[in-house]
């Protein structure tokens, strides 16, 4: 279904946006989707923006206390392109601080799943997924480093699209990890993802990693299941996934199981690279220039920065400490440089399979845990939740997460990964999937 096209064709009743804002305010207090709601919206198709993507004149904090009060004097390239084509900003969405999290609970306002508010919404783009799940006519601009679009999309039952690295400009993004970050989208349909991609991709002089490329729409009939990933998923997810694979097989897709032993190194390689780059990116937040200001200059150097850095959350501090160690001169070659080499090996191996197939897997290895359960997880348990989404993100490949089932009323998703610049082929796959699988939403805020 083309929600964007349908909305633009329909006549909006008088006071539509005021009514939408009023209803959204109530649900936002319940689920924690938005850090900021734009009360000035009065026209255009509503889009939300993850709070680590800059919008001129709107507070942008990446859900961190250290950026409290930061108002960018510019907008990200992707935002300018979409605003030019009739999209209007509904607000800035909640997220794990700086993107550090898989569940949406590493922020001042923990996000809650719209299908069960005792459960997590997924992270780090938690608010983007919640907003998409509760608003009928809406799209979310989000960002993924290791699965930050796919994970919440799966837990909240919406479509999440992560493009090939470089396809959408990162200018205006508050970086987590420069070599891994990708701006992408969430929506209620693959057709709307196609519309968003058409308006967003293309070379940007402000981002040297951005590219101009002609994309084709060709999907693939051969789907590969990677044994090393399949063996690590929860039994209920495995049963659901097996049923989905049977449906696809009956629809004419050729399904194969293959082994990629190197993929087992994805999680440690990802976290070594991302932590090293994150510690560099966070060094700029000192309490002087951006956001939080520490005004007492009578203190000594160490006391001043100790006070400023207290504004970082626990996971941010962990990333800074580990990342700084990894970059140290005495261990850099042992960890960071070796991780870069292994990333290349994994990418080459995956590329060989992706020449004539897509890789299919569940999006997440478990159903959405309760908030209480997630808060009790160790860092290693948290990191292991990304095992299915990290490989494609690590290699810069595009992927799409599609709702595929509902277990005890909770959404689960499948993830389809394509080769470099096979983005629109994945969207075509999603469009075909949606012809036979109906998505369920508990809320349809803003319906006409």
What is each PLM-predicted segment?
Residues 1-76, 98-100, 216, 231, ...:
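Short, well-ordered alpha-helical
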Residues 46-48, 90, 222-226:
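Short, well-ordered beta-strand segments
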Residues 221-222, 226-227, 258-271, 318:
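Flexible, acidic loop-helix segments that line cofactor/substrate-binding pockets
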Residues 8-11, 66-70, 181-188, 324-329, ...:
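Short, well-ordered beta-strand elements within core beta-sheets of diverse protein domains
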Residues 7, 20, 193, 223, ...:
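Residue-level signal for inorganic ion chemistry
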Residues 33-36, 162-240, 244, 303-306, ...:
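A short helix-breaking turn/cap at a secondary-structure junction
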Residues 50, 194, 200, 255, ...:
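Glycine-rich, small-residue loops and helix-cap segments
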Residues 83-197, 398-404, 410-413:
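Short glycine/serine-rich loop segments
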């Amino acid at each position: 279904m083309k929600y964007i096209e349908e909305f633009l064709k329909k006549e909006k009743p008088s006071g539509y946006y005021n009514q939408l804002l009023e209803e959204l305010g109530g649900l936002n207090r319940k689920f924690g989707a938005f850090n900021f709601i734009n009360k000035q919206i009065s026209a255009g198709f509503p889009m939300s923006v993850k709070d680590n993507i800059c919008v001129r004149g709107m507070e942008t904090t990446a859900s961190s206390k250290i950026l409290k009060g930061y108002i960018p004097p510019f907008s990200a390239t992707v935002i300018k392109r979409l605003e030019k084509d009739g999209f209007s900003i509904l607000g800035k969405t909640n997220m794990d601080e700086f993107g550090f999290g898989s569940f949406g609970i590493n922020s001042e306002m923990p996000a809650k799943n719209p299908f069960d508010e005792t459960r997590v919404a997924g992270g780090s783009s938690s608010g983007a997924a919640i907003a998409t799940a509760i608003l009928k006519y809406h799209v979310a601009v989000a960002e993924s480093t290791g699965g930050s679009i796919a994970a919440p999309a799966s837990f909240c039952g919406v479509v999440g699209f992560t493009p090939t690295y470089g396809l959408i400009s990162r200018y205006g993004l508050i970086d987590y990890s420069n070599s891994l970050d990708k701006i992408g989208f969430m929506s209620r349909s693959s057709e709307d993802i196609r519309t968003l991609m058409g308006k967003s991709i293309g070379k940007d002089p402000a981002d040297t990693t951005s590219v101009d490329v002609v994309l084709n729409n060709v999907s693939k009939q051969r789907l590969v299941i990677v044994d090393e990933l399949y063996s690590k998923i929860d039994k209920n997810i495995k049963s659901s996934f097996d049923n989905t694979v049977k449906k696809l097989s009956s629809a004419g897709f050729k399904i194969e199981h293959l082994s990629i032993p190197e993929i087992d190194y994805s999680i440690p390689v990802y976290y070594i690279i991302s932590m090293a780059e994150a510690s560099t990116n966070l060094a700029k937040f000192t309490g002087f220039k951006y956001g939080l200001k520490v005004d007492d200059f009578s203190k000594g150097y160490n006391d001043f920065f100790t006070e400023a850095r207290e504004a970082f959350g626990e996971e941010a501090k962990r990333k800074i400490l580990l990342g700084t160690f990894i970059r140290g001169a005495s261990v850099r070659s042992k960890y960071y440089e070796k991780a870069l080499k292994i990333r290349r090996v994994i990418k080459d191996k995956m590329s060989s399979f992706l020449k004539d197939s897509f890789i299919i897997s569940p999006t997440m290895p478990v159903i959405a845990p309760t908030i209480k359960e997630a808060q009790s997880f160790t860092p290693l348990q948290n990191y292991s939740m990304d095992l299915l989404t990290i490989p494609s993100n690590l290699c810069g490949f595009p992927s799409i997460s599609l709702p595929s089932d509902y277990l005890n009323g909770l959404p689960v998703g499948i993830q389809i990964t394509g080769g470099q610049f096979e983005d629109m082929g994945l969207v075509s796959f999603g469009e075909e999937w949606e012809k036979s699988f109906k998505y369920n939403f508990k809320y349809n805020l803003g319906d006409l």
